[in-house]
Curated annotation (Swiss-Prot):
Gene Ontology terms, MF aspect: lyase activity
InterPro entries: ClpP/crotonase-like_dom_sf, Enoyl-CoA_hydra/iso, Enoyl-CoA_hydra_C
GO cellular component, one term: mitochondrion
SUPFAM superfamilies per record: ClpP/crotonase
Quaternary structure (record): Homohexamer.
Gene3D superfamilies per UniProt: 2-enoyl-CoA Hydratase, Chain A, domain 1 (3.90.226.10), Lyase 2-enoyl-coa Hydratase, Chain A, domain 2 (1.10.12.10)
Coiled-coil regions listed in the entry: none
Keyword flag Mitochondrion: yes
Transit peptide boundaries: 1-37
GO biological process: fatty acid beta-oxidation
Family: Belongs to the enoyl-CoA hydratase/isomerase family.
UniProt entry keywords in alphabetical sequence: Branched-chain amino acid catabolism, Lyase, Mitochondrion, Transit peptide, Virulence
Descriptive protein name: Methylglutaconyl-CoA hydratase 1, mitochondrial
Length: 349
């Protein structure tokens, strides 16, 4: 048997199941169009793109970082790829209101009113890794050693603007971390609404040990998430934090416990560590997609309004968002479904 995993969220106890029984969402559907963002085309895309059907309408988009030889370190090419993927989702929604941009042809065919493909609008985004040993190792320091000061400034500006664009997406965003997320890798995960970590995951902001500080949002996004004292501890010491501690700190929203095989099982496994990393990556991605699907069971307009309301909490914001949802077709459908004792079918209108 492979390593065992179990999901720890807000429930005190849950069932344990072998990772081989977990769904394999990334392999069950065809990968979307391959996109390249550098003059020299790599053997594989720097980001694997998979669209999974979302409940009600649209799709859940899965982006898997794919630079195995560099542990997904962020190079200029990978950053350009990520920026285009984020912007392709952002273009489906109004930058000011977060509402879907009307596209009647998709509305007619898929029930939503946005989207740049036949799969309809993107309802949620999962950011994961195609590399078992690393979620993201931060900036590509080997590449940056050859930068001029001007090139360094340009790279940082692009990095910060891309992270800000990810942070500003109006749909639910989830990071699936099953190994190491260091420096800019953790800062990338901090830009998503939710983070799913496995018990063997390691996260850190080690920049002070390199004589600098986090420069892509870590010093303001981390304190906002886990509090000033805890964030200061992580940033100033640069220490590594396990998945379990990250869950305790509030950095992880879901913790998937991955247990190593016992001695008998290990004897049948040529590389126990590789088997554990593989099981962990699959378990984290499965739970992230499950969370995305669970969220997408709700009304798309209501979900986006709720995200906006809690992002800038105030009575004024809540009132404004409530006014946005109260007169929608989805709201009427929910009332009708309740009366008819069935699940509502939301269309994002």
């Amino acid at each position: 048997m492979p390593p065992v995993s179990r999901i720890l969220s807000y429930a005190p106890r849950v069932a344990i199941r072998p990772s081989s029984q977990l769904a394999r969402p990334a392999r069950a559907f065809a990968v979307g169009t391959v996109r390249y963002y550098s003059a020299e085309q790599p053997e594989e895309p720097l980001i694997r793109v998979t669209d999974l059907p979302a409940p009600n309408s649209g799709h859940i988009r899965v982006l898997e970082l794919n630079r195995p030889k560099a542990r997904n370190a962020i190079s200029r090419a990978l950053l350009a790829s990520l920026r285009e993927e984020v912007h392709s989702i952002a273009r489906q929604y109004d930058a000011q209101t977060g509402e879907e941009i009307p596209t009647p042809s998709w509305n007619k065919r898929f029930g939503g009113i946005a989207g740049d493909s036949e799969k309809g609008p993107t309802r949620a985004l999962v950011l994961a890794s195609a590399v078992e040993s690393s979620f993201c190792a931060g900036a590509d320091l080997k590449e940056r050693r050859g930068f001029t000061q001007e090139e360094t400034n340009e790279f940082l500006a692009n990095l910060r603007s891309t992270f800000a664009a990810l942070d500003a997406l109006p749909i639910p965003t989830i990071s699936a971390i099953s190994s190491r997320a260091l420096g800019g890798g953790l800062e990338l995960a901090l830009c998503t609404h939710f983070r799913v970590l496995t018990s063997n995951a390691i996260v850190s902001l080690p920049e002070t040990r390199l004589g600098i500080i986090p420069g892509a949002g870590g010093t303001h996004r981390l304190p906002r998430l886990i509090g000033l004292g805890r964030a200061r501890d992580m940033i100033v010491t640069g220490r590594a934090v396990s998945g379990a501690e990250a869950y305790f700190l509030g950095l992880a929203d879901r913790l998937v416990e991955v247990l190593p095989p016992d001695e008998q099982e290990a004897a049948d496994t040529t590389d126990k560590d590789a088997a554990l990393l593989s099981a962990a990556r699959e378990a984290a991605l499965t739970e992230a997609v499950r969370l995305a699907s669970q969220i997408c069971e709700g009304g798309p307009i209501g979900i986006r309004a709720a995200l906006q309301a809690v992002q800038a909490p105030s009575q004024e914001t809540e009132n404004k968002m409530y006014e946005r949802v109260i007169g929608t077709e989805d709201r009427n459908e929910a009332l009708k479904a309740f009366a008819e004792k069935r699940k509502p079918v939301f269309k994002g209108r």
